[in-house]
Amino acid sequence: MAVPKRKQSRANTHARRSQWKAEVPTLVKTVENGKVTYSLPHRAKVVEDSAGTALFLEYKGRKVADV
């Protein structure tokens, strides 16, 4: 395992950590039953009835799995 030769300064530590940034997820806008919803691309979505009960999973307009 690598062992540092000497202690890293706070400035260098903060400069290194400043490169770690969270990315904003890209969302796809879809219209379901007159409502606009946003979801992650390339993911199966849950199709619900009017009462909110999950019916099945759908991907690209096709039924892919039962819930």
UniProtKB/Swiss-Prot annotation:
Q: Which Pfam families match?
A: Ribosomal_L32p
Q: Which domain of life is it from?
A: Bacteria
Q: Which GO terms describe its molecular function?
A: structural constituent of ribosome
The alphabetical list of record keywords is: Ribonucleoprotein, Ribosomal protein
Region described as Disordered: 1-20
Q: Which family does it belong to?
A: Belongs to the bacterial ribosomal protein bL32 family.
Extract the NCBIfam families matched here: rpmF_bact (TIGR01031)
Task: Report the protein name in the record.
Answer: Large ribosomal subunit protein bL32
The source organism is Leifsonia xyli subsp. xyli (strain CTCB07)
Q: Which gene encodes it?
A: rpmF
